[in-house]
Amino acid sequence: MEYTTLGDTGMTVSRICLGCMSFGSSDWREWVLDEEESRPIIERAIDLGINFFDTANVYSDGESERVLGNVLADYDRDEQVVATKVYHRMDEDDPNSSGLSRKTIDQELEASLDRLGMETIDLYQTHRWDYDTPIEETLRALYDAVRREKVRYIGTSSQWAHQFADALYASDRLGLERFVSMQNHYNLVYREEEREMLPLCAKEGVGVVPWSPLARGYLTRPHDEFLETVRGEYMDDSWAADRIDIYRANGGTEINGRVEELAAEHGVTMAQIALAWVLHKDVVDAPIVGTTSIDHLEDAVEALEIDLSDSDLEYLEEPYEPVAINGHE
């Protein structure tokens, strides 16, 4: 396993972050694994040297946090970097169970700690931008969480670059904790973050932890085969349909074909080529890889060993055309 520090912090993380959205309960999404099925994957990740785990309170309505916490309880907590997120509605009857107000952050942080069975969260991230709460209120609540030793670092996810710049400026102006990481939507078939967000992160020393580096599985197998998978069928009539549509549009299908071609040339899987491309980006610290299979997890780790040439990178990138901004909702 390769390791790096997260942004300008001194915290060391594995270059592969295990995404835990697929662990929890199939009552939430049909492709999600329960604890018994999830445990071997998380344990294998630790065996492979992964020390960075990302979840969110909303994943499986909290069950993902509980599953992750139960498995990690069998290991040395100090050796793991645990990240979770807050923003989305957790209780239909409680309007304060969503957003980024002080009240929401305080109560949802305690709920996450309880489900994880931990005293401190290493990286507590805001899941989306809250248009109803001043960023200063959010930052003060997060600052207080760090002072109370409930949280070590704060991060954020999926927003406009001007919003992120506002947040960083507010932290500096008020002497509050700064966001140290950006979890954003970035892969070979969705590169809009290269325009403003990634240069901003590089300039400000913010760690980049991309979600969906394999385009929700679209870059793991040929286009037509993907549409026949459970997730491919699921996307056609779901909340994620707009995302797979943008992957297929404006050069995406051709990029999928080129990933398949290079995978054959290198004697590796399509997923490994797509992930190697993300890992070759200097601004990226650790892509978040979600999986329901130990084999696929091992494939992801092996992608660290793939050396793509400049011509390979150019060949993969050349068909890309701009698409609408996606993932900020």
For the regions a language model picked out, list residue spans one by one.
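Active-site groove signature of glycoside hydrolases
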Residues: 113-132
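N-terminal binding-site loop/beta-alpha segment at the start of enzyme catalytic domains
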Residues: 1-80
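Active-site beta-loop-alpha junctions enriched in small/polar residues
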Residues: 21, 56-58, 85-89, 126-129, ...
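Short, acidic/polar
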Residues: 32-45, 100-116, 164-169
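Structural motif corresponding to the early beta-alpha repeats
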Residues: 75-99
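Active-site mouth loops of central-metabolism enzymes
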Residues: 23-36, 92-103, 127-132
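Beta/alpha (TIM)-barrel catalytic core signal, keyed to glycine-rich beta->alpha loops juxtaposed to Asp/Glu
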Residues: 133-318
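Acidic (Asp/Glu)-rich catalytic clusters
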Residues: 8, 47, 69-81, 113-117, ...
